[in-house]
Amino acid sequence: MPSSKNSPQSHLKESVVSESQPSSAGNTRSSVARMLDILDLFTPTTTKVQVDEVGQLLGVGRSTSYRYFQELCDSGLLVQQGKGWYTLGSRVIELEQLLQLSDPLLNAGKTVMTDMLDICQNRTLLLCTLFKDRVLCIHQIGPDHITHNNEKMPIYRGRGSALPLFQGAGSQIILAHLVPHQIRSMYLLRQDEITAAGLGTSWKEFRTNLTMIRKQGFVTTVGKLNPRVLALAVPINNYAGQITGSLLLLCNNTNTEREHVLNLIPRLKSECQRISELKLDFIRRQDLVVNNKLF
């Protein structure tokens, strides 16, 4: 597997190097955590991994590497497809189904977004959430493509897609609402990516841009892969005011369509509030079920 600065392999190397060092409490990164790092190597372009190469990336011996893979196979998270080659296993499908039933944001979002199909004529609406250092699309309504002058433009950021934290409206609106120490840590670790995304060439400029986004209450961007696609995102906060996700609307990048979707911002913000309320209600109902079972 070729490695580059921004590849999953390079991030895994950085993780192993930094997180294997003793922490302030004197702990080291556990073998379980190192084993689970293997799952981070799977991407849309890397759908199988080789045991020998992973052993080198993890900095462990051949026997340890094989043991990690065997344990992941025993759990159903991986399956061997050939000599030394592994892909994701069937347990992942089972977990995905359980996630559909149990995730509060997903269930609340699906309920609300069902009532928003009226704004999805030649537009796609996505529900996004923060996952580690990236943003994940977890639900989608509307078409899989947007038509522009009789040309069908595919939506590249559909359900299950991971978006870079600094690129795109759905990500930037979440980034702007992170707590200050998270934003500061992001800047210290990812200055090059922040600059490349046009979010600032200094800490002061970066912080100022995020403050402006928060005050504005929404973000619009033009597609990096297709500049004829316009993206508009608004934040979803929980009952405590903390960011929990975003609603991302994709449409044609024309003056007329831009005006139309900007007029939809109050509606989108109202629906985000509904998602937050339904999410809290879903959590309370889950707690009630658990308590009734336990007591």
Predicted segment positions?
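Amphipathic alpha-helical regulatory segments at dimerization interfaces
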Residues: 41, 57, 108-119, 126, ...
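A structural signal for short hydrophobic beta-strand segments in well-ordered beta-sheet cores
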Residues: 78-79, 128, 236
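Short, solvent-exposed recognition segments
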Residues: 3-5, 12-14, 149-225, 295
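Amphipathic alpha-helical effector-binding/dimerization core
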Residues: 88-189
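Cysteine/selenocysteine-centered motifs that mediate thiol-based redox chemistry or coordinate metal-sulfur cofactors
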Residues: 190-193, 271-295
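Short, solvent-exposed cationic patches
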Residues: 162-165, 262-282
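Extended hydrophobic
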Residues: 196-272, 291-295
